Amino acid sequence: MEADFTKPDARTVCVLLATGAYDALSEPLRAFVDGLRGLHRFAPPPGARATGLFEEKTQQQPLLTEHPLVRVHPETGRKSLLISPSFLFAIDGLAPRESQALLELLFEHSIRPEFTVRFKWEPGSVAFWDNRATAHLAPQDVFATAFDRQLYRVTLGGDAAVGADGRESVALSGNPVALAQALRDN
């Protein structure tokens, strides 16, 4: 990812080390979350608004996916939490209150300082991270300012997330590849 900013103090990105966050869970909690599946909805984060073709396409065909809560890295075999406060909204099979309580616990746990790396953008900076073992967080106030923030992102196609139980992620609604192609072609 490369970024251009006009607001000097909005140049930080936070990357969560999802493998470390998983490893630091207690053994009983790891055993519990290993088999759980999360429901993810692709939508603009709070405070942001989709515009134009993106908004039209995502309203026509919402992107809803079931991912394992714990993902196994295809190359290293390490487990990591596959959680994102921006997308993950429920845990399949749990009552709403149970789901919300567990998500809050996992979100709070995963953003502890020992699991985060902060990267400060400088002119010409380019950052790479492995989304199979990390999670990206934009600055909290990025959408509450009048300053421009332009990001250039390359996402490499890869494999579907596989959980500790061996099951892959499943698209429940929408097609993210078709959406990306439609946006690219227009």
Describe each PLM feature range:
Residues 1-126, 131-186:
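Non-heme Fe(II) oxygenase catalytic core, chiefly the N-lobe of the double-stranded beta-helix
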